[in-house]
UniProtKB/Swiss-Prot annotation:
GO BP field: rRNA catabolic process; rRNA processing; tRNA processing
Top-rank taxon: Bacteria
Binding site for phosphate: 86, 124-126
Keyword Protein biosynthesis: no
Record flagged with keyword tRNA processing: yes
InterPro entries linked: ExoRNase_PH_dom1, ExoRNase_PH_dom2, ExoRNase_PH_dom2_sf, PNPase/RNase_PH_dom_sf, Ribosomal_Su5_D2-typ_SF, RNase_PH, RNase_PH_bac-type, RNase_PH_CS
Top-level taxonomy: Bacteria, Pseudomonadati, Pseudomonadota, Alphaproteobacteria, Hyphomicrobiales
EC number(s) on file: 2.7.7.56
Protein name (record): Ribonuclease PH
Amino acid sequence: MRPSKRAADAMRDVTLERAVARYAEGSCLVTFGNTRVLCTASLEERGPPWLRGSGKGWVTAEYAMLPRATHERTRREVNSGKPSGRTQEIQRLIGRSLRAVTNLPALGERQITVDCDVIQADGGTRTASITGAWVALHDCFAWMRARSIISVDPLKDHVAAVSCGIYKGQPVLDLDYAEDSAAETDANFVVTGKGGIVEVQGTAELEPFTDEQFLELLRLAKGGVAGLVELQRKAIA
């Protein structure tokens, strides 16, 4: 049995609260159970230098954890001089996921930076970040359209993400920290609203996993993402 007593295919309670940051063009507070992430989307009128003259915009992301988001205080990464390898990996993943569903030429030569700040971590911070970041980005684009900065919605589709793993021999959906820290296999799936796969990250911690187990994890993930996309739709309605 899972520590949370959830069924194998059950997500934690998920909420998406919009417009939580007064000054950001778009914002969302996302919760996956006890994991809470504040996502803000900010418009910058200039894109990256390497896109100058291309007529194309850019979407990028930054990720950070508050010092007491975890059981014990962690040092702010700014005090060490640079982001950790884990932080860089996660923020690149968030950016790739958002760009996969964005029509970049529709932005013009502008950049949207989505900041994902983990308030409380209980597993699945990167998947929660992607799911909430999409809502913040949606609202940023709506803000831009309302002011005639852009004429069309650059979003091509929804995107959301969920973790899956093998815990005590059983494939399960949406691991919390207790499961993640003891799982034999841990994987993250980023999937669009139409069911297209943006990215898969999977690691066997103890025993290699089989093709059959991977396909079961994929099935669980697609079901989980379908539910998350429906929550996104309701949140922006």
